From Swiss-Prot:
Expressed in both central and peripheral nervous systems. InterPro entries: ADR_fam, GPCR_Rhodpsn, GPCR_Rhodpsn_7TM. Signal peptide: none annotated. The chain crosses the membrane at residues 114-134, 146-166, 190-206, 228-248, 267-287, 421-441, 454-474. It comes from Drosophila melanogaster. Residues 326-387 are annotated as: Disordered. This is Dopamine receptor 2. Glycans are attached at N5, N31, N47, N68.
């Protein structure tokens, strides 16, 4: 029954009781055969379909229920997000988010749960990185400070940006949190994503400086300089995000559509932000990693060549050789054998090096004849026992050897770090390149993108996958971070489990013991301290 004003008494009673819009629609949709004429106070002049509301509440859609509005028949299916203000001045109750979530179909609920789980994994993994660098002193390096800044940006993406985007996508681009928070959320999305990309760019520059100029790098990359670079990253990211939102709100024509969270599609801003946020950092990263790869190949080749030259001349182990003093291999060999009874041979290789250890250790190398005999009790002691005839020469030579081993170990760690960060860069390109291609294409030719909303959602979440992948890459490729992660994860475990994993971690006392081992070998020349074991402990 409809009164003179065109409104239903049941509806008025429900509205007076403060029932939500979905309940009103449920009351009106009970009689499927009755043709209704809802008043303008319901939907007014809005060309709005009730399909999604009926779908969410298990009611017949417009294909089964004919709705004849007083102004015009509803023909298009729009988003359920709306504020229906009628010509009579009556405002319908605003849709409630909780009711929408309760009425979601199972497939949408599963998608929402998956996206929330993905957001949690991003926050959890990056929080591990942050806590690891804070707790473990051996991770207090300039590179790891940059990685911490990257983890902070990625963690905030998972904490602030992803959950609201998940709701927005699952509810078919419906925004329930107001216009102000929409603008803030969009600006934070730009801020954190740009900061993540720029941090990767700074990390690539840091690795480039460390590998191409390793001697001056420790003096150049101080804590203050690292803090300055991190501050520059966040200031630049803020300059791209927040002022643009202020400009966007001032230049926007009219009010933002109700229950929508749109962002500027101005071509100038899209080109500017994409260039600063992605394309320039991408060029810098590609350039630096190409140079890093070339430098690593050259240094690795030179180390191998230098080691082989000394191996052919003296027959010693690799870590006791190759000293950069400007001299030749013959000079280095004479330094080792010059003070004892061995008698260093000339360049023709006819000489021999022999000695007798106090514990019946003996070995003989005949370079000319090509024969080698060895009768040691402990073969691993040969590199040290071969030098015991001349204490001063042994002391100098071992000091050089240990210095070389430290350089080799440091270079190996630098090269592995560069490889790890190269993988990070590759994942970064795969994740973010589609988004910025679509971002620019939407400014030039939005019609060229079929199913634009679906494509935008896919490439956006693909970019956010990068924030979740970085901690996984650190755990898989960085032994230091892997140790720190195990420590953190075992803190809540029983003491037996913590003790089980404790020997696999290099503690502070173990690092000091390693240094004492090198000091003892260098100063006192103890014959039974194995060179190889010292090196393995150090590395």
């Amino acid at each position: 029954m409809v009164d003179d004003n065109g409104s239903s008494p049941e509806v008025e009673g429900a509205e007076g009781a403060g029932a939500p819009l979905l309940a009103l629609l449920r009351v009106d949709g009970l009689n499927q055969t009755q043709t209704r004429s809802p008043s303008p106070s319901f939907f007014g002049s809005y060309n709005i379909s009730e399909d999604v509301y009926f779908y969410f509440n298990g009611l017949p859609t417009s294909t089964e229920l004919v709705l004849n509005a007083t102004t015009s028949a509803t023909s298009a299916t729009l988003s359920p997000a709306m504020v229906a203000t009628g010509g009579g001045g009556t405002t319908t109750p605003e849709p409630d988010l909780s009711e929408f979530l309760e009425a979601l179909p199972n497939d949408r609920v599963g998608l929402l749960a998956f996206l929330f789980l993905f957001s949690f994994a991003t926050v959890f993994g990056n929080s591990l990185v942050i806590l690891a660098v804070i707790r473990e002193r051996y991770l207090h390096t300039a590179t790891n400070y940059f990685i911490t800044s990257l983890a902070v940006a990625d963690c905030l993406v998972g904490l602030v940006v992803m959950p609201f985007s998940a709701l927005y996508e699952v509810l078919e681009n419906t925004w329930f949190f107001g216009t102000d928070w929409c603008d803030i959320w969009r600006s934070l999305d730009v801020l954190f994503s740009t900061a993540s990309i720029l941090n990767l760019c700074v990390i690539s520059l840091d690795r480039y400086w460390a590998i191409t100029d390793p001697f001056s790098y420790p003096m150049r990359m101080t804590v203050k300089r690292a803090a300055g670079l991190i501050a520059a990253v966040w200031i630049c990211s803020s300059a791209i995000s927040f002022p643009a939102i202020v400009w966007w709100r001032a230049a926007r024509d009219g009010e933002m559509p109700a229950y929508k969270c749109t962002f500027t599609e101005h071509l100038g801003y899209l080109v500017f932000s994409s260039t600063i946020s992605f394309y320039l950092p991408l060029l810098v990263m590609v350039f630096t990693y190409c140079r890093i790869y070339r430098a690593a190949v050259i240094q690795t080749r030179s180390l191998k060549i230098g080691t082989k030259q000394v191996l052919m001349a003296s027959g010693e182990l690799q870590l006791t050789l190759r000293i950069h003093r400007g001299g030749t291999t013959r000079d280095q060999q004479n330094q080792v054998s010059g003070g004892g009874g061995g008698g260093g041979g000339g360049g023709g290789g006819g000489g021999s090096l022999s000695h007798s250890h106090s514990h019946s250790h003996h070995h003989h190398h005949n370079h000319g004849g090509g024969t080698t005999t060895s009768t040691p009790e402990e073969p691993d002691d040969e590199p040290l026992s071969a030098l015991h005839n001349n204490g001063l020469a042994r002391h100098r030579h071992m000091g050089k050897n240990f210095s070389l081993s430290r350089k080799l170990a440091k270079f190996a760690k630098e090269k592995k770090a560069a490889k790890t960060l190269g993988i990070v860069m590759g994942v970064f390109i795969i994740c973010w390149l589609p988004f910025f291609v679509v971002n620019l294409l939407s400014g030039f030719c939005i019609e060229c993108i079929e199913h634009e909303e679906i494509v935008s959602a896919i490439v956006t979440w693909l970019g956010w996958i990068n924030s979740c992948m970085n901690p996984v890459i650190y755990a898989c490729w960085s032994r230091d971070f892997r140790r720190a992660f195990v420590r953190l994860l075992c803190m809540c475990c029983p003491r037996k489990i913590r003790r089980k994993y404790q020997p696999t971690m290099r503690s502070k006392s173990q690092r000091f013991a390693t240094r004492r081992c090198y000091s003892t070998c260098s100063l006192h020349g103890i014959q039974h301290v194995r060179h190889n074991s010292c090196e393995q402990t150090y590395i």
